[in-house]
Amino acid sequence: MMQLFYQNNKTGDTWDLATVSEKVEFKTTRKGSAWSVEITLYNSTKVAFEYGSPLAFKLDDKEVFFGYLTKVKYEKDTKTTLTFHDQIKYLLRNINFVARDKNVNQIVSAIAGDFDLKIGELKAPAVTLSPQLKEDKKALDIIQEAMDETLVQSGELLVLYDKFGELTLTTPKNLPIQYIIGNESFM
């Protein structure tokens, strides 16, 4: 059973949008972009939508996606389309960043703190990275460069993703499924 729990940030009211949805599209990407859920609803609903309000998507009681409302499109044919993105979207903004004697866990934590993002487990090797001086660069690119340098120094490949509302940094061996299927997977 699919559940799409939406909570309005201003009123605190909560709805299960699965009961009034016509179509649900879950989009994932391997790197460089945020995951998203796009929901098409019948306009007969009395739900008030506020940007930044959270959505929890569960399938058979398993946590699939947690994101925030970023787009509302009202259509003439009595439908509304909502788009929610996970926290990775906020890392696509350009920032200036300076760090010295830090490891990738500390860099992710510092950047997430600057954006007021929630952090989960950060399980990267604690190798000290070269000094970081970045100007007007995407926060996600800064993190990716730190992950790349950690790979070179430690030999450990790292994965950064939003695990149901918490930025998580780990190695593929710590993931529940250790296969990647897609255009770049060579499968």
Residues covered by each model-derived region:
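Short beta-strand-centered interaction patches in the first periplasmic/extracellular domains
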Residues: 79-80, 86-87, 121-187
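A short local loop/turn or secondary-structure capping micro-motif enriched for an aromatic residue
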Residues: 74, 91-92, 176-179
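Glycine-rich, acidic and aromatic/proline-enriched surface loops and short helix-turn segments
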Residues: 103-120
